[in-house]
């Protein structure tokens, strides 16, 4: 059965309590496409790698999409600010960390994963000048609402598994307060 349209402001008024850390997402549609409403703030340091493109629309406030850009050679870390009213299409297989700030809301649309495809959650060393891969988890994504959260929670619980094999730094499981510039304060 085809359901009715979702009035986003009304949905947020009635359901914003469903947007819970560490991901703060809620899947409103989950079929051939997954449509998530995502609120802020969130607390994660992972970079998600999806074999399909992801579409972002920022309904309220601005967010920062931290990416590892393979097109600039040597996997350059960079930030893309998506402001209120902006939409952005992230190419498939681009490592990305969506950073959401207080009182912000966005919509993310993802395709259903092809059979046999693996999503990856990757954590990089945060020490200046290092950037080595600290840990990577792979899974066939069938439920975005729970699987990403499970991977983040497992990383949080494994302090020794967060140690960089290249420099010895222990990676943070969530960003340190004030470590990421909030474009909403500019």
From Swiss-Prot:
Pfam families xref list: 3-HAO
EC number: 1.13.11.6
Biological pathway: Cofactor biosynthesis; NAD(+) biosynthesis; quinolinate from L-kynurenine: step 3/3
A GO MF label: ferrous iron binding
Enzyme type, top EC level: oxidoreductase
Keyword Oxidoreductase listed: yes
Record-level GO BP terms: 'de novo' NAD biosynthetic process from L-tryptophan; anthranilate metabolic process; L-tryptophan catabolic process; quinolinate biosynthetic process
Catalytic function, reaction form: 3-hydroxyanthranilate + O2 = (2Z,4Z)-2-amino-3-carboxymuconate 6-semialdehyde
Keyword field: Cytoplasm, Dioxygenase, Iron, Metal-binding, Oxidoreductase, Pyridine nucleotide biosynthesis
Database matches in InterPro entries: 3hydroanth_dOase, RmlC-like_jellyroll, RmlC_Cupin_sf
Binding, O2: 44
Residues noted as binding Fe cation in the record, renumbered to the chain: 48, 54, 96
Annotated substrate binding sites: 54, 100, 110
Principal location: cytoplasm
Family: Belongs to the 3-HAO family.
Protein name: 3-hydroxyanthranilate 3,4-dioxygenase
